[in-house]
Amino acid sequence: MSRYRGPRFKKIRRLGALPGLTSKRPRAGSDPRNQELSGNKSQYRIRLEEKQKLRFHYGLTERQLLKYVRIAGKAKGPTGQVLLQLLEMRLDNILFRLGMASTIPQARQLVNHRHILVNGRIVDIPSYRCKPRDIITAKDDQKSKAMIQNSLESPPHEEVPKHLTFHPFQYKGLVNQIIDSEWVGLKINELLVVEYYSRQTKT
């Protein structure tokens, strides 16, 4: 299944706020979690919607998300928490959380078009896994810095999470540590996502 490129507001009306996909928010009272009680939904649908929220927020294909679930399942620690850490430490997401891009798709474009350096070297792979002490900067040219400046000046501005530090005048971000679960940028029940994929990960 390919990455979603359809109407974004349609998705947030159904799934709730997806800040990685769009800065728009559903109107008050339009959040489906307020409209429907969980008891009116099947357990499969509840798990499916949590999985879809994760996929659309981080801009992943179905195959990519399943791959991350399988990696998380083999790692030490709770699978759901490891999954969120893997997704949050992607370069495209780090750029978004720093405020250097307004959305994750925009961050992915910055990386694909070679505007971003990690530790002084151009990285053009959005899924690049950042690690503590990584230094993320804009390429030293006017176009790269102008694109990031536009994002910095575009509301809304989310608080930079504690595992990151951003120096706006230098267009530079630092990864201080692996993200803690309380700083994940999406309201999600990751356990439901793991349960959704439980059959696929056993095959």
From Swiss-Prot:
The keyword RNA-binding applies. Keywords: Chloroplast, Plastid, Ribonucleoprotein, Ribosomal protein, RNA-binding, rRNA-binding. This is Small ribosomal subunit protein uS4c. Part of the 30S ribosomal subunit. Contacts protein S5. The interaction surface between S4 and S5 is involved in control of translational fidelity. InterPro entries: Ribosomal_uS4, Ribosomal_uS4_bac-type, Ribosomal_uS4_CS, Ribosomal_uS4_N, S4_RNA-bd, S4_RNA-bd_sf. GO terms for cellular component: chloroplast; small ribosomal subunit. Residues 15-42 are annotated as: Disordered. It comes from Oenothera elata subsp. hookeri (Hooker's evening primrose). Residues 89-150 form the S4 RNA-binding domain. GO terms for biological process: ribosomal small subunit biogenesis; translation. CDD domains: S4.
